[in-house]
Amino acid sequence: MFSRIALLPAFLPVALACLGYEGGVPTPTAHYSNSAVIEIAAGEVFDAGWAKYDRGSGACGGQTEGDWKDAVFYLHSGATLKNVIIGADQSEGVHCDGACTLEFVWFEDVCEDAISIKNDKEGEETWIIGGGAYHADDKVVQHNGCGTVNIINFYAEDYGKVYRSCGNCSSQCKRNVYVEGTTARDGGEVVGINQSFGDTATLVNVCTDADHPCVLYDGCEGDCEPSKVGYCSG
């Protein structure tokens, strides 16, 4: 059953609006395969003009975790990436070193993680606006920093988790996620957060068929495995 979730009962419009674009990945205007990651400097904006970028045939190694050098794009703090399609031939999609902004970034077939956010500080905000991701066996957004991730009008289909707060980073902290106007189909959890570290999740106008859109974990530090402990309420 497809449902609409609003975990904030106050200050909501009368009609729920799930605005994730459901028309599929946009048709690319060009296609570039690069042997190395593309870096976007702090504060700069990279507008791809709806071109598709990847790392070449055979780049995806399944769920083998890579680092920023394996990504298609590497954004330094405050950088913006917009109007781009990340092709299937990649190990890691987009890495952000600090808070970043992604506007209309599409992932046609996620390999390990689509978006990894690291080193953002408490009080800093990452914005993921529009765009979407298909076929993420595990996570679409992996959040290892300590700030807030805002996911607005996103679309996800065939996924494990749209957002996951790092369950076993070597140094843990409180993280926040805000999801609004997002559509998530044929997947697992919309968000997974660590109850043990005080994480917060707010879901507003989220359309999903997930049995439990927001899942709580007992996160841990280092060489350990976080355990699922319950579900969010609101």
UniProtKB/Swiss-Prot annotation:
Reactions it catalyzes: Eliminative cleavage of (1->4)-alpha-D-galacturonan to give oligosaccharides with 4-deoxy-alpha-D-galact-4-enuronosyl groups at their non-reducing ends
Enzymatic class: lyase
Cited SUPFAM superfamilies: Pectin lyase-like (SSF51126)
Signal peptide range: 1-17
Any one Gene Ontology molecular-function term assigned to this protein's record: pectate lyase activity
Superkingdom classification of source: Eukaryota
InterPro entries according to UniProt: Pectate_lyase_PlyH/PlyE-like, Pectin_lyas_fold, Pectin_lyase_fold/virulence
Glycosylation-annotated residues: N168, N194
Tagged with keyword Endoplasmic reticulum: no
Cofactor(s) required for function per UniProt: Ca(2+)
Cofactor notes: Binds 1 Ca(2+) ion per subunit.
Gene Ontology cellular component annotations, sorted alphabetically: extracellular region
Pfam family membership, one: Pectate_lyase
One of the protein's GO biological processes: cell wall organization
E.C. code: 4.2.2.2
Subcellular location: Secreted
Keywords: Calcium, Carbohydrate metabolism, Cell wall biogenesis/degradation, Glycoprotein, Lyase, Polysaccharide degradation, Secreted, Signal
Main location: secreted
Biological role stated in the UniProt entry: Pectinolytic enzyme consist of four classes of enzymes: pectin lyase, polygalacturonase, pectin methylesterase and rhamnogalacturonase. Among pectinolytic enzymes, pectin lyase is the most important in depolymerization of pectin, since it cleaves internal glycosidic bonds of highly methylated pectins. Favors pectate, the anion, over pectin, the methyl ester.
Stated family: Belongs to the polysaccharide lyase 3 family.
Name used for this protein in its record: Probable pectate lyase F
Organism placement in taxonomy: Eukaryota, Fungi, Dikarya, Ascomycota, Pezizomycotina
Gene: plyF
